[in-house]
């Protein structure tokens, strides 16, 4: 087995190079910024490619040595991807709210995990019939709450050996706890992130769904590679195992030419109704397509412009919007 392959083209198609609006940046990320386009910082993918390779190598090495990797991503667009990648690679995850002390107060967290397992026994064992309806409801609610918070680490059995983090701004408590304990951190850093203290920084968009899917898929496959290497070191023949690990199918190709939809506005959404012919209903359709800013419309090529027009029911109108959007973007700068 080997580390998963990826290309700069894949990163481009996933929108990894799109940073935040230029006024929403952390100057410490300047070394990773290629330039500005339509008031959006563009990340230098020539640095992302080797940085991502180093992070994947760290994941593979950690797992090969019997270590645990903890995926951390609690923002909405990362929750499912993080959980799926961790499960697929036999690792661990936190995709709900990060509980303070989840690393630095592991003993208390362990007690909560033990309580979760006890509740499962109480609600599924022979004694379940001894509870009243109200008692079962109370116990079920407690179990669901613990499962949501701790389900991804219930079998971790101790502190992780490496954290993989999506969005260090949102997961700042997790990062600080890892740094305090000397646990290495591999993290996706957008242009508004702080790279200080990150062991394996990977400059890239941390909001776009397709970018997050790509990161999680690559890290999961790197962990699977580490499992394979670990088995080889132990003399285990993977071909004889009953259920070999699967690396999964590649992501679907993008339906867009160069446009990268956003899962939500970056900061405050622009008032797209300023564009000629854009009613509140049309603005909502644009939002549903992942369009929230004039800069996105200004950057559309002819293929994507035609598709946007067809999707909102105004074919041929988008070319005029592009010209207007460029003017509005220039005014914002």
Swiss-Prot record:
It comes from the Bacteria. InterPro entries: Ribosomal_uS2 (IPR001865), Ribosomal_uS2_bac/mit/plastid (IPR005706), Ribosomal_uS2_CS (IPR018130), Ribosomal_uS2_flav_dom_sf (IPR023591). Signal peptide: none annotated. Transmembrane segments: none annotated. PROSITE patterns: RIBOSOMAL_S2_1 (PS00962), RIBOSOMAL_S2_2 (PS00963). GO terms for molecular function: structural constituent of ribosome. This is Small ribosomal subunit protein uS2. It comes from Azorhizobium caulinodans (strain ATCC 43989 / DSM 5975 / JCM 20966 / LMG 6465 / NBRC 14845 / NCIMB 13405 / ORS 571). The gene is rpsB.
């Amino acid at each position: 087995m080997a580390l998963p392959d990826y290309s700069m083209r894949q990163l481009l198609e996933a929108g990894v190079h799109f940073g935040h609006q230029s006024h929403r940046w952390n100057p410490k990320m300047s070394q990773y910024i290629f330039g500005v386009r339509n008031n959006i910082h563009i990340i230098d993918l020539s640095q992302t490619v080797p940085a991502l390779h180093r992070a994947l190598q760290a994941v593979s090495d950690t797992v090969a040595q019997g270590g645990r990797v903890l995926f951390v991503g609690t923002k909405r667009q990362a929750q499912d991807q993080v959980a799926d990648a961790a499960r697929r690679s036999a690792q661990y995850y936190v995709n709900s709210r990060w509980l303070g002390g989840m690393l630095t107060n592991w003993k208390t967290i362990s007690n909560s995990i033990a309580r979760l397992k006890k509740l499962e026994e109480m609600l599924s064992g022979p004694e379940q019939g001894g509870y009243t309806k109200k008692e079962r409801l109370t116990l079920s609610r407690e179990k669901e709450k613990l499962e949501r918070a701790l389900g991804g680490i219930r079998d971790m059995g101790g502190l992780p050996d490496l954290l993989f983090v999506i969005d260090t701004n949102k997961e700042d408590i997790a990062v600080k706890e890892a740094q305090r304990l000397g646990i290495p951190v591999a993290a996706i850093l957008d242009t508004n992130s702080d790279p200080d203290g990150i062991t394996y920084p990977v400059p890239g968009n941390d909001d776009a769904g397709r970018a997050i899917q790509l990161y999680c898929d690559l890290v999961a496959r790197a962990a699977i590679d580490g499992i394979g290497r670990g088995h080889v070191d132990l003399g285990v023949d993977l071909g004889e195992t009953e259920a070999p690990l699967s690396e999964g199918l590649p992501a679907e190709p993008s339906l867009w030419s160069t446009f990268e939809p956003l899962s939500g506005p970056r900061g405050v959404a622009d008032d797209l109704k300023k564009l000629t012919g854009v009613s509140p209903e049309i603005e909502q359709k644009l939002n549903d397509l992942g369009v929230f800013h004039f800069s996105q419309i200004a950057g559309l090529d002819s293929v994507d412009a035609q598709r946007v027009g067809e999707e909102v029911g105004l074919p041929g109108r988008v070319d005029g919007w592009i010209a207007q959007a460029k003017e509005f973007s220039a005014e914002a700068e």
